[in-house]
Design a protein with these regions (language model features):
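N-terminal pro-sequences and low-complexity stem/linker regions of secreted or lumenal proteins
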Residues: 1-197
């Protein structure tokens, strides 16, 4: 059972579901633990020592790379992010793994811009909902504002634009389906994963 602060993920995390040996975590920062991805401390069987500096990503790809899923926490700010995105893309593109790769670039915020499209209804996750950890009573039955995503792969036709509704649960949903695992929540079970791309 994974936990973040006092909130417990009754169904575990995507790392529990896939298994630690299939996942690799990178972050642009290296050094003291305080600079590491804070949520790592909440993921069962994953710790700060499992987060590797992004500087070693390209060299790791050149070796035998056994990981089916790689999560990269980027730098913050547009200039740094653009540089890191290019570096990550080029590392994957120039590796022997390119022909079997899918690079998904997501954003966790919409940038503060007005969105004329109201958020539609969403399938609530269906996992444990404890009002004690949700003082505003949000039940996750509505999506938030739209955020962009970029999907890059030799398997996707260049210039493809997809208007299908996806959400942040589409990534772990795709992973569970790809690796033949049970979804963590109802939302993951029903999330779009881009099969038509």
């Amino acid at each position: 059972e994974a936990q973040l602060g006092n909130f417990k993920f009754a169904n575990g995390s995507i790392y529990d579901r896939l298994g630690k040996s299939k996942c690799r975590l990178y972050q642009h920062k290296s050094g003291p633990l305080s600079g590491k991805i804070p949520q790592v401390a909440a993921i069962k069987n994953v710790n700060f020592g499992d987060v590797r500096p992004l500087a070693g990503f390209e060299a790791d790809l050149a070796k035998s790379y056994p990981f089916g899923y790689t999560f990269i926490e980027p730098a913050y700010g547009n200039i740094l992010n653009n540089s890191y995105r290019a570096k990550i893309y080029n590392a994957i593109r120039n590796s022997s793994l390119w022909d079997q790769s899918l690079l998904v670039i997501t954003f966790d915020e919409h940038g503060g811009f007005y969105d004329h499209v109201p958020p539609p209804a969403a399938i609530p996750p269906g996992d444990a909902f404890n009002p004690k950890h949700n003082k505003h009573g949000f039940d996750f039955s509505t999506y938030g504002v739209r955020v962009p995503a970029v999907v890059v792969s030799p398997w996707i036709k260049a210039g493809t634009i997809d208007h299908t509704l996806y959400d942040h649960s589409s990534v772990p949903a795709a992973l569970t389906r790809l690796f033949g695992k049970e979804p963590l929540t109802k939302r993951l079970r029903d999330a779009g994963i881009g099969e038509g791309l």
